[in-house]
Amino acid sequence: MSESVYKVIELVGTSSDSWEKAAANAVEQAGKSLRDLRVAEVIKLDMQLDAKGKVEAFRAKLSVSFKFEGT
């Protein structure tokens, strides 16, 4: 097995429906511009509220790794 290096970035996904969809949105969007995604780990879950305290959006902060192809 050859040696590999992975880069780790943080992303925040949002959804008006759920934290699960917020996390999935972040990974799906990252997959459009990053190749070889490997692992996504949920770091933090929170909600965006309006002035009356009603939930406007669910937010998921993720740590995502992908294979580094630097020289």
PLM region descriptions:
Residues S4-R38:
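Short, well-ordered alpha-helical segments
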Residues G13-S15, K44, L62, F66-F68:
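Flexible glycine-/small-residue-rich
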Residues M1-S2, T71:
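Basic/polar N-terminal segments that are highly enriched at the extreme N-terminus
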Residues K52-T71:
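C-terminal structural segments of small proteins and small subunits
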Residues E41-M47:
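Short, conserved loop-to-beta-strand elements that form functional interface hotspots
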